[in-house]
Design a protein with these regions (language model features):
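Extreme N-terminal leader/targeting segments of oxidoreductases
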Residues: 1-7, 25-26, 30-31
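Short beta-strand "acidic-cap" motif of Rossmann-like dinucleotide-binding folds
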Residues: 30-36, 132
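Gly/Ala-rich phosphate-binding loop of Rossmann-like dinucleotide-binding domains
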Residues: 20, 24, 171-173
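Short hydrophobic core segments
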Residues: 7-10, 35, 185, 204-206
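Helical element adjacent to the flavin cofactor pocket in flavoenzyme catalytic cores
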Residues: 114, 121-126, 148-206
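Glycine-rich Rossmann-fold phosphate-binding loop(s) that bind the pyrophosphate
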Residues: 11-17, 37
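Dinucleotide-binding Rossmann-like beta1-alpha1 core, especially the glycine-rich loop
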Residues: 54-137
Length: 206
């Protein structure tokens, strides 16, 4: 059949689910439809290691090397994003085993210590709240005699990604989002002043 919506979101992975939720949070009056070709969170969003990091530059050294002038802003944006994830999980009671675990980048050889210390000095100078841990403190967190030291990044968590997806879907529906699983988008075409999204079994007009 044919239905209408103010906003159509394609894909019920984490990006699509969060887009739909944020749209309804900001504009509750919007009629939002979310189309998913399979099941909610069945692909990469629900089948990953569950690491939730504030870094949006694939690590501090990489970000500083590529975008030195913008890194502090990028780091602040990443931290704000992590806080937003945590707030959404807490505010809506999403049961997804989220833990602010932190992350350790460890040294297993003495010569690696200087590199880790340089990492910390450089990252902190650009706004990242990381710490160098000596061998004793590192082994207190992870009982292995191999570890000579570590960089500790507190802005990292871990989550059950599938349960996060299912929880976000529940929140989206509670906010009024209409979710259609097994409805892969086949085409996107202009339609009057809006757009038309077609699936195998119907069409959504905006």
């Amino acid at each position: 059949g044919v239905t209408t919506a103010d906003l159509v979101v394609v894909g019920a992975g984490l990006s699509g689910l969060w887009t739909a939720v944020r749209a309804k949070q900001r504009r509750p009056e919007l009629d939002v439809v979310l189309l998913e070709g399979g099941r909610i969170g069945q692909s990469a969003s629900g089948r990953n290691g569950g690491f939730v990091a504030a870094s949006i530059t694939h690590g501090h050294p990489n970000g500083i090397e590529r975008w030195p002038a913008e890194f502090a802003t990028l780091q602040a944006m990443g931290v704000e994003n992590l806080r937003g994830i945590e707030k959404t999980i807490a505010d809506y009671g999403i049961d997804c085993d989220y833990q602010r675990s932190g992350e350790l980048q460890v040294a297993t050889e003495p010569y690696q210590i200087a590199h880790l210390q340089e990492h910390v000095e450089l990252a902190r100078a650009h706004g990242a709240e990381v710490e160098f841990w000596d061998a004793e403190r590192t082994r207190g967190a992870v009982a292995s005699p191999l570890y000579q030291g570590a960089v500790h990044d507190p802005e990292v968590g871990i989550v059950d990604p599938a349960r996060l997806c299912w929880g976000l879907a529940r929140v989206a529906e509670e906010l009024g989002v209409r979710i259609h699983e097994h409805s892969p988008a086949q085409s996107l075409q202009p339609s009057g002043a809006g757009m038309s999204v077609s699936t195998y079994s119907g069409r959504v007009e905006t």
